[in-house]
Amino acid sequence: GFVDLAKKVVGGIRNALGI
């Protein structure tokens, strides 16, 4: 669903930032 997709996007961004 949209929520799962949003979580994946946020997780990817945080991972890219090294947070």
Curated annotation (Swiss-Prot):
Entry keyword set: Amphibian defense peptide, Antibiotic, Antimicrobial, Secreted
Single GO biological process annotation from the record: defense response to bacterium
Cellular compartments annotated: Secreted
InterPro entries: Aurein_antimicrobial_peptide
Name of the protein: Uperin-2.2
Known tissue expression: Expressed by the skin dorsal glands.
Lineage: Eukaryota, Metazoa, Chordata, Craniata, Vertebrata
Pfam families, sorted: Antimicrobial20 (PF08256)
Functional summary from the UniProt entry: Shows a weak antibacterial activity against B.cereus, E.coli, L.mesenteriodes, L.innocua, M.luteus, P.haemolytica, S.aureus and S.uberis.
Cellular component GO terms held in the UniProt record: extracellular region
Superkingdom classification of source: Eukaryota
